[in-house]
From Swiss-Prot:
Family matches, as Pfam families: Rhodanese, UPF0176_N
Catalytic activity annotation: uridine(34) in tRNA + AH2 + O2 = 5-hydroxyuridine(34) in tRNA + A + H2O
HAMAP family linked to this entry: TrhO
GO biological process, one term: tRNA modification
Organism classification: Bacteria, Pseudomonadati, Pseudomonadota, Gammaproteobacteria, Vibrionales
Enzyme Commission designation: 1.14.-.-
The protein's enzyme class: oxidoreductase
Rhodanese domain location: 123-217
Name under which the protein is recorded: tRNA uridine(34) hydroxylase
Organism: Aliivibrio salmonicida (strain LFI1238) (Vibrio salmonicida (strain LFI1238))
Length: 326
């Protein structure tokens, strides 16, 4: 059985010519049948891709040919199936979107903590441990002692800090995320806001799960990942979660037994969030997916993704209205 190397990577580095990198990077991915998405911006590179061992090694060698990307941070895991449908290299304003101007992890950032030293830090009662990930990620797994900010997107994090954290009260703050990149931005932001002792887990949750034995671990549950595996367990293997193709949120076997679940159309988390017209489109898309599967092909559709972005924008506008009415 063929195995795929899933490679999550990022690096904050000045890439003024990032638009010119897109074409050759796309070419090396396509030539080596690597799928996934990489983001390029003037502040660096970020993304997750998957391919054969030889293909991923070729990509990493390609990065080494550019001195700016030679030491790109990456973490690998293995999967039995290709977790991505497409090959994409996108140009962005930020490689991880916080929406705050002037936050530069190359200028200031929190203190990195190795996975081997993480347990001791977060067990300190004087340390406030904050999970910087989104609410749906935290729901399926997090560290013992961690606070859930209940953010819907990373853009909500600055508001959480403004409303809940105080440099005079919270002297020591530790943060973590999936692979480390969000903490680069969040710790930089915290330092800019006057927080002195700010720490973050080097390599993120994935590196911790890789290096810390499960019997010594303070991780509880599974770790959400942004690919077809949905979530991984402590052994970095695909766990029991699937994804609802209507809202893209993780679902369990129990969710699939609910009367609110219709494959590709709705789940208990989104049953009331889509119109009947939207659900009809989802049913048609699911039909096309099944037909493609019968032909041994992969169906790629965009309706669900568009609706998710629309829903995020609606929630953002609702929050802004609530804040302005206070």
């Amino acid at each position: 059985m063929s195995q795929y190397i899933v490679c999550a990577l990022y690096k904050f580095v000045s890439l003024e010519d990032y638009t010119e990198i897109r074409q050759p990077l796309t070419q090396v991915m396509e030539d080596n049948q690597i799928r996934g998405t990489l983001l390029l911006a003037s502040e660096g590179i970020n993304g997750t891709v998957a391919g054969s061992r030889k293909a991923i090694d070729t990509l990493l060698t390609w990065f080494k040919e550019d001195s700016r990307l030679a030491d790109v941070v990456y973490k690998e895991s293995i999967n039995d199936v290709q977790p991505f449908n497409r090959t994409k290299v996108k140009l962005k304003k930020e490689i991880v979107t916080m929406g705050v101007e002037g936050i530069d992890p190359l200028h200031v950032v929190g203190t990195y903590v190795k996975p081997a030293d993480w347990n001791a830090l977060i067990s300190d009662p004087d340390v406030l441990l904050v999970d910087t990930r989104n609410d749906y990620e935290v729901d399926i797994g997090t560290f013992k002692y961690a606070v859930n900010p209940k953010t819907e997107t990373f853009r909500d994090f600055p508001q959480y800090v403004a409303e809940n954290l105080d440099p005079a009260k919270h002297k020591k703050v530790a943060m973590f995320c999936t692979g480390g990149i969000r903490c680069e931005k969040s710790t930089a932001y915290m330092k800019e806001q006057g927080f002195d002792e700010v720490y973050h887990l080097e390599g993120g949750i994935l590196k911790y799960l890789e290096e810390v034995p499960e019997e010594n671990s303070l991780w509880e549950g599974d770790c959400y990942v942004f690919d077809g595996r949905v979530a991984v367990n402590h052994q970095l293997e695909k766990s029991h979660y699937d994804v609802c193709n209507a809202c893209r949120l993780p679902i369990t076997d129990e969710d699939k037994q609910s009367d609110s679940f219709e494959k590709g159309v709705s789940c208990p988390k989104c049953i009331d969030q889509h119109t009947e017209e939207q659900k009809s489109r989802f049913r048609e898309r699911e039909k096309q997916v099944q037909l493609a599967n019968e032909r041994g092909e992969t169906h790629v559709g965009g309706d669900a993704a568009k609706l998710i972005e629309q829903r995020k924008q609606e929630k953002k506008e609702k929050k802004q209205q609530q804040r302005s009415s206070k």
